[in-house]
Structure formats: structure tokens, C-alpha cells
Amino acid sequence: MQTRDLPWRAKSLKGVHEKMLWRDESTEATIALIKFEKGAGIPQPHLHASNQFMFCLEGRYEYTATGVVLTPGSFYCNPKGNVHGPTIAHEETVVVEMYDGPHYPVKPDWYSDEKDAH
């Protein structure tokens, strides 16, 4: 698979796009490329139903409550149940995002499309 050949799918949260690379339907584990336009991010503190792993390929992405900033080459883990966020992309940012199970216990309010929470 050449990721450059896959189209970006706009999520229902403005400025956020994804390329789903792999998904296990039985466990809901995923690997995806996520692109945040400059100024986009997750607007509220939240938690995940599984472990979330992020590897930054390009840009600058900040967890504003803690000041953690991802830049190219940064790896970050949000353990299952750990409250984190909000976040903001200070420039266009692309990350590899991996979950080892379902993304959210329930669909967050900032997504109007149920598919965006999986």
C-alpha cells in the first residue's frame, strides 16, 4: 500500500482528516494517518477505551493542558482511561495514530458522525 495514493477522509470535526491504514473489526484496533490543519485539534479533555499511541511525522501538535508538544519524530502514549487534551495543531500536522482496541467508551460530542469515533 502506498499511503500517498489513499484519499484523506474529512472527519466531522473541522480541520481533521484521516487515512485508515488498518482496522481489526473484532478488537477495533486501528492504525491511521491523522492530519490536523493549522489551528485544528480536539476541543475538550477526554479519555480513550484503549491505549492510544501517536508518532508525529510532520508539524507541531500540542496537548495544551500539559504543554506536551509533538514534533517530527516524537512518540506519545495515552494509556487507557487517562484524561488528556484539549489539543491544537500549531501548524499542519500529520501523525500515525494507533489504538490497541476501541477508541472511545462513547462518541464524543465534537463528532457528529459515529464513524469518526471508531
Can you describe what each PLM-predicted range is?
Residues 29-31, 51, 93-94:
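Structural motif
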Residues 64-83:
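Short acidic-glycine-tyrosine-enriched beta hairpin
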